[in-house]
Amino acid sequence: MKVLGRNLVDPFPEFWSDIEDDLFITYYDVTSGSEEVFGDQHFDSGSSVTPRWLTLPDEDLAYHVAHELTHLLLKSKGFPSVGRGVRYPENSAEAIVGSDLEELVVHQPLEWIIAQYGFTRDFILDTMYEGAKSGLSSGNVPGYGTPWFFTWAIRYAELSTILSPLEWKVLKNIYRSKSPDIVSLGEELRDIITKMDPGVPDLVLEAMVLCRNLMGLGVEDRILIIDNRNGEMF
């Protein structure tokens, strides 16, 4: 199987064979780099620009495509997602924080599924580590309770669960030197996501609500948690 001419190496064929019947997309949607699979990072046939992810090493490319497909798989199985009230536009702080929150929580069941196949993403993780180290070292500390304060805390929780112990130790020390308050919130968020059962939609939804409420963003429809099984919002 290929995407835009690039081979999707093992274990992708086995992964695709296992999940294709549960997805509301086609084989062509994957191989053509479509918006249905890759969102705003899709391939535009009318443009000479290729998506950045197409330059990834073979193993990381296979992981990346599996990652995007697993997002769709989770929605098809009723795992929750994040929305916001109609008063908040796409570029609002609520949209940004909500998107980061969804990624943080949903990545737990997502990685739980992908890990069963033995995908690797060394290049992606190295890039994330170097980018985070540079950004944290040079960035100004966001004010307490601001949207960027929440995104920094969410990033803390996420990075603490995916980086190697040595890499995380470096970043954690930078976080501590920058803002103990962000560290405190990040630790609480991490505790919630690491204690939930990633295979149960109800428990993932509960964890998402807890994280949202912990940040105080459950008022005025600022961040809504959507149960994709019935459309109910919390």
What does each of the following model-derived ranges do?
Residues 1-46, 57-58, 96-98, 102-104, ...:
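Auxiliary, metal-adjacent structural segments of Zn-dependent hydrolase domains
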Residues 50-66:
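Short pre-active-site segment immediately N-terminal to the catalytic Zn-binding motif
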Residues 59, 74-108:
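Post-HEXXH active-site segment of zinc metalloproteases
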Residues 63, 67, 104-111, 144-148:
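Non-catalytic, well-ordered alpha-helical scaffold segments
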Residues 64, 68-72, 76:
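Catalytic glutamate of the conserved HExxH
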Residues 80-86, 120-130:
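Short acidic alpha-helical/loop segments enriched in Asp/Glu that coordinate divalent cations
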Residues 88-90, 130-135:
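Short, conserved phosphate-binding/catalytic loop or strand-edge motifs used
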Residues 132-234:
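Pan-zinc metallopeptidase signature
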